From Swiss-Prot:
It catalyses: a 1,2-diacyl-sn-glycero-3-phospho-(1D-myo-inositol-4,5-bisphosphate) + ATP = a 1,2-diacyl-sn-glycero-3-phospho-(1D-myo-inositol-3,4,5-trisphosphate) + ADP + H(+); a 1,2-diacyl-sn-glycero-3-phospho-(1D-myo-inositol) + ATP = a 1,2-diacyl-sn-glycero-3-phospho-(1D-myo-inositol-3-phosphate) + ADP + H(+); 1-octadecanoyl-2-(5Z,8Z,11Z,14Z)-eicosatetraenoyl-sn-glycero-3-phospho-1D-myo-inositol 4,5-bisphosphate + ATP = 1-octadecanoyl-2-(5Z,8Z,11Z,14Z-eicosatetraenoyl)-sn-glycero-3-phospho-(1D-myo-inositol 3,4,5-triphosphate) + ADP + H(+). Residues 287-312 are annotated as: Disordered. Residues 187-278 form the PI3K-RBD domain. It comes from Mus musculus (Mouse). The gene is Pik3cd. Pathway: Phospholipid metabolism; phosphatidylinositol phosphate biosynthesis. Residues 496-673 form the PIK helical domain. The lineage of its organism: Eukaryota, Metazoa, Chordata, Craniata, Vertebrata. One of its GO terms (molecular function) is 1-phosphatidylinositol-3-kinase activity. The keyword Phosphoprotein applies. Its EC number is 2.7.1.137, 2.7.1.153. Pfam families: PI3_PI4_kinase, PI3K_C2, PI3K_p85B, PI3K_rbd, PI3Ka. Residues 744-1026 form the PI3K/PI4K catalytic domain. Signal peptide: none annotated. This is Phosphatidylinositol 4,5-bisphosphate 3-kinase catalytic subunit delta isoform.
Length: 1043
């Protein structure tokens, strides 16, 4: 490729030639030009360059090769130092095939880590530096120290504690009733295969599923001593059991049947294969994975500064004048010239409007409209709450065309929203902001209520300053000195003077209000009563804190002080109530701190269950440094599994401008506190990058060639060294305990859907058949809704198991990893209902009505006595998914997104529609039934007998019990879905979507009424199942996907 020709990313991913001609610029001014392998790493290229440079002029002026570093211009047109010389040229993908060698400056280790972090989080750390934002700089310094101290503490852990951090236990839910649910396996004998680390010899033992890991290890040590005729000197306490071929360990005082791996083996009839690992090996791993020598740089001791006079400041509460701002002008406004421009401004505390909105005068449309207008709000400066935000909406107005027969003289005007922006009135140090501000605005999107202002939106300006519309405002100086919000001591001092009223009749009214209207809007007189009885709420109804906070007058500083004084002595809340306080409706920082304090009692498993929502709630935070961020980072640095998923939840949204800064800073902090895990994550990132390039290649190739030809070219591409290296020997992003060892190229393929998802298969020699793992890589589909749905199904599974009800669910892994990209776990040994029916039928038109197809397929996969167990698995899982899909309102159910495993477990896939957002055609709802319960399902449940009502009634009982259990936890689902509104999912954007859950769980009814409601839906699903079969017939005929 000649100099001056740009190299788009496609050039580096296409393998037209193994080499590329690169221009090299040496520090001496010498220019060299020669071909190098695109697969070569920078270290190799530097060696070749040095060999050639010795024959060029001025070579004697060059220092040692290690004194120089390559730079290039990257795909975003930025000059980039290539500190990591193990990276390949094809992975770097410079914009031009030009590499410049420059003298290395600064600390190489530090620069290398910074380079790796930048690559990993998808944002250069120099971008954070260039902001010159004091809040960003203070946050980075504080979080770096926080995370590196956590890393230093981790290096001092004993081997068991370090094992708990690196390989957290994977246990089945253990609670009341669940132990009883395990009794049927607890009494069984279990064959376990155990070998010792570094030895090929293995022993098979028969143990009880009630035995602890220590008992199994003691048995193995005795066997080893007997076989090799050695004295028994080693103790089982010095060992842990590793699952072969996985990053998963068994340890601690738990019966074997409580470990997920053992339970999985029991259900599938496989023999567990374990390796005994000595504590010295685990300590060696700890030392190898420790952070490099502490990066916390303690500043040199300096002589104490000369005492300075404390700058004068003014308390906000001493200023009683009305709050006002000056609207100066707009910039880069784009609107129809026939319209008029208006700015609306409002003061908000969460969703609550603190006073009436104010609007500017109308001005003619132009690129830079000028107002120079004072906007005064109906609130005193002293009453501004700490978390008050000033919200702006820029919109155009146009007179609606008057109808011919209209007799109205006054013409109506229509609003056309253009952009919005939000600004916190106080900075992160509690100081009231003053002076001129330029607010870069975000484009407006239609709102269901037609609201112009967006108080829940980000308070960060649009980073696209080159083209974004902007407002210039002036915040006046309200005092001769800086104005600060009062410190907590001053707040409490004022708050303790609040009155306390107590009347017996009012106590009864209070109880009735909190119980009757626990989740609805209160009338004004009810709000007044709840506030008046706030001390009684604290004493007798502490879980109603959210209700009290909502009635607090946040535009009256005396009431705010009394509320916060009460909060200081409020009893710690249960997790459910604390989760509710993280919603945008409760922005106060002291309330947030109290909520996090209540959440600290969460176990790691519970925290992991809610992690997705907690990450989304970060978007509501007004400042970078907040309790929620520190809480998540602290737990992530104490549990690598939590750290893994925290990273990917953040990384998957780095393309969203409104959160890229916050999420990038949190990831940077995490990486500095876990540099070894950073390398693991980088390996995953490299694999995902290769899969995206491979998918792009397949999409283009499939348009030109047949599927077999494209598949063969896909395999050729995968066999290249760079692909094999990137795609092999990594931890699965879907589950870090799963190792993706050797990629099985011949078994890899792509699917026929529009986005051509890749189907990638792996094998592991050490794990045997259990090491066969498949992943699906999707590029072009938004997987966030699938991930949320599967999270809820997994939560349902946990809640059921805690009540002793194991419905054999299959909540397979699903993880978005970037902008419309992500991974899905392959559920092996399974097939779709459509394929089973089509393969058992002669015609696609009759396949949907072949009621024997499913049962015959199960018989072929489960001969003899195994069939009864398979039918039981089908019955349990069918009950679970009937209830789950009904409660979640999952739509678009057809025979291609319902699957069955060979073991009998039924499960659903592809959750593109939920919460009752069903597909329609020609205005007609295509979803005719509450959930899928067809007669061929019933045929399997009844074991192929038409009069086996006992089996069917047992199935109905499973459904009713499962539904009743979910109802008891209804508020948990409501809170979790409410918090997920921050994600911006199209089908979870308004209160109507949440209302669907309230209706499906019948939360406004008694348990007896709710059960009656569910029975009506159950009978309807069974009665109307013929409509489902008609839909399936149409689906099968239109897409005869027989395989």
């Amino acid at each position: 490729m000649p100099p001056g020709v740009d190299c788009p990313m496609e050039f580096w991913t296409k393998e037209e030639s193994q080499s590329v001609v690169v221009d090299f610029l040496l520090p001496t001014g010498v220019y060299l030009n020669f071909p190098v392998s695109r697969n070569a790493n920078l270290s190799t290229i530097k060696q070749v360059l040095w060999h050639r440079a010795q024959y060029e002029p001025l070579f004697h002026m060059l220092s040692d090769p290690e004194a120089y570093v390559f730079t290039c211009v990257n795909q975003t047109a930025e000059q980039q130092e290539l500190e990591d010389e193990q990276r390949r040229l094809c992975d770097i993908q410079p914009f031009l095939p030009v590499l410049r060698l420059v003298a290395r400056e600064g600390d190489r280790v530090k620069k290398l880590i910074n380079s790796q972090i930048s690559l990993l989080i998808g944002k250069g750390l120099h971008e954070f530096d260039s902001l010159r934002d004091p809040e960003v700089n203070d946050f980075r310094t504080k979080m770096r120290q926080f995370c590196e101290e956590a890393a230093a503490h981790r290096q001092q852990l004993g081997w068991v504690e370090w094992l708990q951090y690196s390989f957290p236990l994977q246990l089945e839910p253990s609670a009341r009733g669940w132990r009883a649910g395990l009794l049927r396996v607890s009494n069984r004998a279990l064959l376990v295969n155990v070998k010792f680390e570094g030895s090929e010899e293995s022993f098979t033992f028969q143990v009880s599923t009630k035995d602890m890991p220590l008992a199994l290890m003691a048995c193995a040590l005795r066997k080893k001593a007997t076989v090799f005729r050695q004295p028994l000197v080693e103790q089982p306490e010095e060992y842990a059991l590793q699952v072969n071929g996985r990053h998963e360990y068994l340890y601690g005082n738990y019966p074997l049947c409580h470990f997920q791996y053992i339970c999985s083996c029991l259900h599938s009839g496989l023999t567990p294969h374990l390796t005994m690992v000595h504590s010295s090996s685990i300590l060696a791993m700890r030392d190898e994975q420790s952070n490099p020598a502490p990066q916390v740089q303690k500043p040199r001791a300096k002589p104490p500064p000369i005492p300075a006079k404390k700058p004068s400041s003014v308390s906000l509460w001493s200023l009683e004048q009305p709050f006002s701002i000056e609207l100066i002008e707009g910039r880069k406004v784009n609107a129809d010239e026939r319209m008029k421009l208006v700015v609306q401004a409002g003061l908000f505390h969460g969703n609550e409007m603190l006073c009436k909105t104010v609007s500017s005068s109308e001005v003619n449309v132009c690129s830079e409209p000028v107002w120079k207008q004072r906007l005064e709000f109906d609130i005193s400066v002293c009453d501004l709450p700490r978390m008050a935000r000033l919200c702006f909406a820029l919109y155009a107005v146009v007179e609606k065309a008057k109808k011919a027969r209209s007799t109205k003289k006054k013409s109506k005007k229509a609003d056309c929203p253009i952009a919005w922006a939000n600004l916190m009135l106080f900075d992160y140090k509690d100081q009231l902001k003053t002076g001129e501000r330029c607010l870069y605005m975000w484009p407006s999107v239609p709102d269901e209520k037609g609201e112009l202002l967006n108080p829940a939106g980000t308070v960060r300006g649009n980073p696209n300053t080159e083209s974004a519309a902007a407002l210039v405002i002036y915040l006046p100086e309200v005092a001769p000195h800086p104005v600060y919000f009062p410190a907590l001591e001053k707040i409490l001092e004022l708050g303790r003077h609040g009155e306390r009223g107590r009347i017996t009749e009012e106590e009864l009214q209070l109880r009735e209000i909190l119980e009757r209207r626990g989740s609805g809007e209160l009338y004004e007189h009810e709000k007044d009563l709840v506030w008046k009885m706030r001390h009684e709420v604290q004493e007798h109804f502490p879980e109603a804190l959210a209700r009290l906070l909502l009635v607090t007058k946040w535009n009256k500083h005396e009431d705010v002080a009394q509320m916060l004084y009460l909060l200081c002595s409020w009893p710690e809340l249960p997790v459910l109530s604390a989760l509710e306080l993280l919603d945008f409706s409760f922005p106060d920082c002291y309330v947030g701190s109290f909520a996090i304090k209540s959440l600290r009692k969460l176990t790691d498993d519970e925290l992991f269950q809610y992690l997705l929502q907690l990450v989304q709630v970060l978007k509501y935070e007004s400042y970078l440094d907040c309790e929620l961020t520190k809480f998540l980072l602290g737990r992530a640095l104490a549990n690598r599994k939590i750290g893994h998923f925290l990273f990917w939840h953040l990384r998957s949204e780095m393309h969203v401008p409104s959160v890229a800064l916050r999420f990038g800073l949190i990831m940077e902090a995490y990486c500095r506190g876990s540099t070894h895990h950073m390398k693991v994550l980088m390996k995953q990132g490299e694999a995902l990058s290769k899969l995206k390039a491979l998918n792009d290649f397949v999409k283009v190739s499939s348009q030109k060639t047949t599927k077999p030809q494209t598949k063969e070219m896909m395999h050729m591409c995968m066999r290249q060294e760079t692909y094999m290296e990137a795609l092999s020997h990594l931890q699965s992003p879907l589950d870090p305990s799963t190792l993706l060892e050797e990629v099985c190229v011949e078994q890899c393929t792509f699917m026929d859907s529009k986005m051509k998802p890749l189907w990638i298969m792996y094998s592991s020699e050490e794990a045997g058949s259990a090491g066969n793992v498949g992943i699906i890589f999707k590029n072009g589909d938004d997987l966030r809704q699938d991930m949320l749905t599967l999270q809820m199904i997994q939560l349902m599974d946990v809640l059921w198991k805690q009540e002793g009800l194991d419905l054999r669910m299959t909540p397979y892994g699903c993880l978005p990893t970037g902008d419309r990209t992500g991974l899905i776990e392959v559920v092996l040994h399974s097939d779709t209902i459509a394929n089973i029916q089509l393969n058992k039928s002669n015609m696609a038109a009759t396949a949907a009505f072949n009621k024997d197809a499913l049962l015959n397929w199960l018989k072929s996969k489960n001969p003899g006595e195994a069939l009864d167990r398979a039918i039981e698995e089908f019955t349990l899982s069918c009950a679970g998914y009937c209830v789950a899909t009904y409660v979640l309102g999952i739509g678009d159910r057809h025979s291609d997104n319902i699957m069955i495993r060979e073991s009998g477990q039924l499960f659903h896939i592809d959750f593109g529609h939920f919460l009752g957002n069903f597909k329609t055609k020609f205005g007609i709802n295509r979803e005719r039934v509450p959930f899928i319960l067809t007669y061929d399902f019933v045929h399997v449940i009844q074991q192929g007998k038409t009069n086996n009502s006992e089996k069917f009634e047992r199935f109905r009982g499973y459904c009713e019990r499962a539904y009743t259990i979910l109802r008891r936890h209804g508020l948990l689902f409501l809170h979790l879905f409410a918090l997920m509104r921050a994600a911006g999912l199209p089908e979870l954007s308004c209160s109507k979507d949440i209302q669907y859950l309230k209706d499906s769980l019948a939360l406004g009814k008694t348990e007896e009424e709710a059960l009656k409601h569910f029975r009506v839906k159950f009978n309807e699903a069974l009665r109307e199942s013929w409509k489902t079969k008609v839909n399936w017939l149409a689906h099968n005929v239109s897409k005869d996907n027989r395989q």
